[in-house]
Swiss-Prot record:
<keyword id="KW-0217">Developmental protein</keyword>
<dbReference type="InterPro" id="IPR009057">
    <property type="entry name" value="Homeodomain-like_sf"/>
</dbReference>
<dbReference type="InterPro" id="IPR000747">
    <property type="entry name" value="HD_engrailed"/>
</dbReference>
<dbReference type="InterPro" id="IPR017970">
    <property type="entry name" value="Homeobox_CS"/>
</dbReference>
<dbReference type="Pfam" id="PF00046">
    <property type="entry name" value="Homeodomain"/>
</dbReference>
<dbReference type="InterPro" id="IPR050720">
    <property type="entry name" value="Engrailed_Homeobox_TFs"/>
</dbReference>
<dbReference type="InterPro" id="IPR001356">
    <property type="entry name" value="HD"/>
</dbReference>
<feature type="compositionally biased region" description="Low complexity">
    <location>
        <begin position="318"/>
        <end position="331"/>
    </location>
</feature>
<dbReference type="GO" id="GO:0030182">
    <property type="term" value="P:neuron differentiation"/>
</dbReference>
<dbReference type="GO" id="GO:0000978">
    <property type="term" value="F:RNA polymerase II cis-regulatory region sequence-specific DNA binding"/>
</dbReference>
<dbReference type="GO" id="GO:0000981">
    <property type="term" value="F:DNA-binding transcription factor activity, RNA polymerase II-specific"/>
</dbReference>
<keyword id="KW-0539">Nucleus</keyword>
<dbReference type="InterPro" id="IPR019549">
    <property type="entry name" value="Homeobox-engrailed_C-terminal"/>
</dbReference>
<feature type="region of interest" description="Disordered">
    <location>
        <begin position="273"/>
        <end position="331"/>
    </location>
</feature>
<comment type="similarity">
    <text>Belongs to the engrailed homeobox family.</text>
</comment>
<dbReference type="InterPro" id="IPR000047">
    <property type="entry name" value="HTH_motif"/>
</dbReference>
<dbReference type="GO" id="GO:0005634">
    <property type="term" value="C:nucleus"/>
</dbReference>
Amino acid sequence: MAAVSAHMQDIKIQDQSDDDPYSPNTRDTTSPECHDDEKSEDISIRSSSFSIHNVLRRSGTTAALTMSFRRKSSWRIPNFDDRNTESVSPVVEVNEREISVDDGNSCCSDDTVLSVGNEAPVSNYEEKASQNTHQELTSFKHIQTHLSAISQLSQNMNVAQPLLLRPSPINPNPIMFLNQPLLFQSPILSQDLKGMPNRQTANVISPTFGLNFGMRLKANHETRTRSDENRYSKPEESRDYINQNCLKFSIDNILKADFGRRITDPLHKRKVKTRYEAKPAPAKDTAAFAPKLDEARVPDIKTPDKAGAIDLSKDDSGSNSGSTSGATSGDSPMVWPAWVYCTRYSDRPSSGRSPRTRRPKKPPGDTASNDEKRPRTAFSGPQLARLKHEFAENRYLTERRRQSLAAELGLAEAQIKIWFQNKRAKIKKASGQRNPLALQLMAQGLYNHSTVPLTKEEEELEMKARERERELKNRC
């Protein structure tokens, strides 16, 4: 309304001004007849039904209806890309038809003050209404862009960040709670979320973090991982600690080379000596339990000046084969790892834990029973020649080859197998080579078994070695 009143004042000023007497919008003001005509026209305008006030009222209501209808249509139709919102309601068309009636008393006639070129107020209202609708549309577009940016940000964060995160209720990020309400973020990741730029500010560096944000984030992560490593011990270290302190017979300790060695602490040795000297036991009664008892006792009651390996073959006759040869060889003898002691050599009955037992010889007058010994197999000349030829080709027979050879010679498979075993043993004995591992275990008293029977010379050598051991013990 203020614009309409200002426009009316401009019209009055134009009527009363004398600067432009020949303007087409004004009449000749010099004659008195002109003033009389203007007065009559003013009176007719005030008294007519299509007066200026009525026209302005109708135009105001039309603009208000147009604005309200456009607002409703913009809320109902969410098409923000269509900016040509020129839909006109039927009510507005009816009002415009009523206003634009072509008659002599109409406001659009040539006689009235508001001619066709003087319709500024209505156009001003329409321009304001269109501006308001455009502002509302732009505000909705801004809201839509903000929502899309937030959703894209949350999707990017979900892809870029790991899911296994420690929950931290100190500084939660509200953006992550849009799509994943159950996910908690740590403070470092929340700072990272705040520092991430949007699409609109992709080229702007955040003033809060600056260029050193990556280095600071890496330093914080390293300090946190170090504190976690110091706080929680590794399972392997704890397992080793348990094995070293509690489980003395664990697999790791058994496989070590120092497992089963004698104790080097002199105080502990003295205590163990006094404990076992107080309760001596006869050797004959405990000969059957010697393996278990000697394993637990011998490593502790060993004399401190002995620097050799452990001697586990204890008996009355002192029958051990070179048990202290490793002790006299040097200060640091070679010690085999503990898994060697768990092999088949120490599981045999004649491995040194018990004295070797031989069958007593019967007098020649007594006849041996038939169940005691199987009669010796006598091979013929062609059979022996065939067996020797086969042994020269291959010392070890397969099962199929043994079956074919037994069918060819008319012998049992067991006979052929035993003949090959005896032949290999004779060759091994004639060569004079022994297994170095067996020799080392025999020197330590852990292995006192030979696959072939001992000759008289070997027995004499063993007796001499035992006598030397006794002399050394007496000197000490």
